[in-house]
Amino acid sequence: MPTWWGRKSCKNKDDNHRGIISTDRDIKSSAVVVDPPLTPTRGGTPRCSREFAGASSAFSGFDSDSTEKKGHPLPRPLLSPVSIHHQDHVSGSTSGSTSVSSVSSSGSADDQSQLVASRGRGDVKFNVAAAPRSPERVSPKAATITTRPTSPRHQRLSGVVSLESSTGRNDDGRSSSECHPLPRPPTSPTSPSAVHGSRIGGGYETSPSGFSTWKKGKFLGSGTFGQVYLGFNSEKGKMCAIKEVKVISDDQTSKECLKQLNQEINLLNQLCHPNIVQYYGSELSEETLSVYLEYVSGGSIHKLLKDYGSFTEPVIQNYTRQILAGLAYLHGRNTVHRDIKGANILVDPNGEIKLADFGMAKHVTAFSTMLSFKGSPYWMAPEVVMSQNGYTHAVDIWSLGCTILEMATSKPPWSQFEGVAAIFKIGNSKDTPEIPDHLSNDAKNFIRLCLQRNPTVRPTASQLLEHPFLRNTTRVASTSLPKDFPPRSYDGNFSLQPTREPYPGRLSHDNYAKQPLSRTIKSPSRENVRAITSLPVSPCSSPLRQLGPAYKSCFLSPPHPSYAFPGQDSGYNLAEFAASPFRMKKDAMMEPSSFRTQTPNSPLRSRLV
């Protein structure tokens, strides 16, 4: 047995007793950081011990012929290829400094095995198997010094405090006891998650197991780009319109459709207006790109004109006002639709207008103009056809004027010419489309303002909303009475002058059978919430009890004070009705039988019969 066997055993026990902290500090100091020479003030530290003398001073471990102070160098750390790669980038030509921890010929195998066992219990940073790196960026400190594990830590190591920080936390502020999440596997181009997804907010989102909540229904028609189907949401029960485009990689037409549809998605995702169709989401599959939009069951203006003929002027006024409201919103966001026409304007059952088909729409900045030739030829503005100096929001105003002519005549302007001839007529001639004679002067003036060839003198959408043609119009879905208009007797036409009756709801007894109730009483405006509430009705005015002429001279009961109309006195004046010039007659159904025995003690009601 060698003479130093006992002393070495004591060293090994002492080394095991020091545990994790001393070995970890030596590994870090020997592998990466070169400690400065020992000073007398550090004499009491573990690095002054004889076991660590070889690794305490700079490059002292290279001297294999050193005497009694020569320590046993630690073995080379079991670095993964990734960590070695990072070390090579940092150390460069100084990688020889790591030979301090290399196996020396002066150390025995037992010492090495014990040191490896001690280091395996205490070190976490270097004893890591090679794992795929996540695509996240690595901080310079993490890349140059250590490679953090990407797999969860063992429970026995969860209580070990990091020695790099005095607070026991990592560089990112998290505690060292937290588990590190596993890296996500790289997504292949053919994986289902890369193909099946839904797009909401500008990016395609993966739906769970490729299952879509929207179910495709019947075919509705073909649009500019693809087909349109009816859709149903299986979770919310909401209807939608599904616009589909075939995804064909080697087809130029399919690529153009996808490009335009993606442009429409990006634009509609940023818009929110009652006169613009609402965007719900989109989904990309292996064969199609589906866009889910608000379903407007009434169809387009073009379809209504085809089915029912040209519109009357009140309908044109109502639709034009709503179209301008949507255009004013778009132009306020520096967006040009570029394809305003009847086929791209939808109408719901209540007469509400929705602008649709934004595949041609374009966002315009203050330093750019549009030069591309896009839109339908019959509705194109002259500056679009000429494409000389570019064009701006005024092109939508010209198209609006053409759409008004379309609604008034059931055909687009310049329809007597073919497509190329119409384009030539718009671009080179000084003529304007013919305006029908049956329209009012305000309507004609409105159309002439929209169809001015000089785009700089065309009014804006906000200015056109103040035109007399639209200023005094109201929605078709609502009554023509203002919100604060109280109920009055109806004399055949609507008048804003109040009647002279003390109680507006009171009717004369001579014309009740010939004259209906006021429209405001029978069907109040939906905008007046208080008028929707049912009013109390006296039995004499009930429609179930009109058996004789006695009940044709009655009046409505006064409203309850809480249901009074604006500007109407809710008081109930009995003296007013006592002065009525007529008498209420008897009712055989309400009065008791005249054959009842009459006695002095009979009730007063029986004695009066």
From Swiss-Prot:
SMART domains: S_TKc. Residues 1-202, 487-511, 590-609 are annotated as: Disordered. This is Mitogen-activated protein kinase kinase kinase 3. Residues 40-64, 90-108 have a biased composition (Low complexity). Residues 214-470 form the Protein kinase domain. Interacts with PBL27. PROSITE patterns: PROTEIN_KINASE_ATP, PROTEIN_KINASE_DOM. CDD domains: STKc_MEKK1_plant. It is an enzyme of class 2 (transferase). Expressed in flower buds, roots, leaves, seedlings, stems and immature siliques. Absent of mature pollen. Belongs to the protein kinase superfamily. STE Ser/Thr protein kinase family. MAP kinase kinase kinase subfamily. The gene is MAPKKK3. SUPFAM superfamilies: Protein kinase-like (PK-like). The lineage of its organism: Eukaryota, Viridiplantae, Streptophyta, Embryophyta, Tracheophyta. It comes from Arabidopsis thaliana.
